[in-house]
Amino acid sequence: MLELSESNIHLNANAIDKQQAIEMAVSALVQAGNVENGYLQGMLARELQTSTFLGNGIAIPHGTLDTRLMVKKTGVQVFQFPQGIEWGEGNIAYVVIGIAARSDEHLSLLRQLTHVLSDEDTAAKLAKITDVAEFCAILMGETIDPFEIPAANISLDVNTQSLLTLVAINAGQLQVQSAVENRFISEVINNAALPLGKGLWVTDSVVGNVKNALAFSRAKTIFSHNGKAVKGVITVSAVGDQINPTLVRLLDDDVQTTLLNGNSTEILTALLGSSSDVETQSVEGAVVGTFTIRNEHGLHARPSANLVNEVKKFTSKITMQNLTRESEVVSAKSLMKIVALGVTQGHRLRFVAEGEDAKQAIESLGKAIANGLGENVSAVPPSEPDTIEIMGDQIHTPAVTEDDNLPANAIEAVFVIKNEQGLHARPSAILVNEVKKYNASVAVQNLDRNSQLVSAKSLMKIVALGVVKGTRLRFVATGEEAQQAIDGIGAVIESGLGE
């Protein structure tokens, strides 16, 4: 978990352009002891590769993979530019978060920040806030608790002909949850409820509100109070904006009808907007693709941006979910939400497309992911096959075969082992040492046993292939030095691997 202090936050900053804003972020990171002086070039180089603008006025400049060694300790520096900074392609950044992180710290840190910043209203607040403590609290999510209504807060079929009884039931329930103080109770009991119409009434208080909460009670039979119908009472405790969408829904005719006639589940769904606000991935006829991420560093900003660009080529609505983390379903066109999924190497992603070009979209995404989304990927195929299916079909078919799942730039060769004793521990170790010389991912397969491709950098896995004299081994390499790796492997096998 990222620790952010007020000293890391710089409000009401000024910069003439994006480069100066990045320079300010790096200077603050250097002064805080997070990075070495040369880190600036890494941040500028990253911007040339892919813009770090996430959306909602937020940019997250950070270094390239080559500059991670210059990071002394993980940290961030946050700058607020109320006037906005042009960040390219017409995007305006109001909050710039300079990040220094190594290895997977980069993804976890981004995930934490984007979880807070994915809300447009929150991002808009951060662009204008003048109090450092409040800015820090919102950025760290300390004041952004999701608004929920427990099922216990819905009381139905109350046998009463008293409006005050319904109010008291609600107030008591809110008090049990520590959502209100005693003065709130006194206020709603002693002051008249307000009629919404259709037999619904509302009570609240300007004092004694502790946290956002709502309770609803409904009489078994309708009755009259001062000449007006009474069927149900809503009692509200409000301390933050998170409850506002629910308050707006109280004015909706359909929601009011549900309050008057629905069961507890239907009422909760209507009040929280669950039926319309939550993404779904179970539409009949939708095309579903399940793919494994093979990028060594997962889906950080650059491959995520490439994924978004691929998605935007198609007109279909496309959502995605990180199955490995059991994440929520998000739009595959939102860079911020994709980065927030915290996808690392080996994670399984589920895409659902709905529309005329849904099948083409999912097939294209599968190929783009298999090819690394602009980065080098492991030559070892995923442990589970990538699949594409159509919702409602009974057949669940692999999207690609193992060979099809190899990156397009993979280089492979087949060599015959000549060692009299095959590949026991010693020659296997020499083979592994040769493979590790190269900046490449190398997988190996025993063709004679039709084994799976396994990492050629694992001594245990090579020995487990059961290679004897005359065995044909297939090597597949990807990466900058793939060809050199294949050539080196061929040479060392030809020389007998030290025997």
Curated annotation (Swiss-Prot):
Residues 2-142 form the PTS EIIA type-2 domain. One of its GO terms (biological process) is phosphoenolpyruvate-dependent sugar phosphotransferase system. PROSITE patterns: PTS_EIIA_TYPE_2 (PS51094), PTS_EIIA_TYPE_2_HIS (PS00372), PTS_HPR_DOM (PS51350), PTS_HPR_HIS (PS00369), PTS_HPR_SER (PS00589). Its main location: cytoplasm. PANTHER family: MANNITOL PERMEASE IIC COMPONENT (PTHR30181), MULTIPHOSPHORYL TRANSFER PROTEIN (PTHR30181:SF3). NCBIfam families: PRK11109.1, PRK13779.1, PTS_HPr_family. The phosphoenolpyruvate-dependent sugar phosphotransferase system (sugar PTS), a major carbohydrate active transport system, catalyzes the phosphorylation of incoming sugar substrates concomitantly with their translocation across the cell membrane. The enzyme II FruAB PTS system is involved in fructose transport. This is Multiphosphoryl transfer protein. The lineage of its organism: Bacteria, Pseudomonadati, Pseudomonadota, Gammaproteobacteria, Pasteurellales. The gene is fruB.
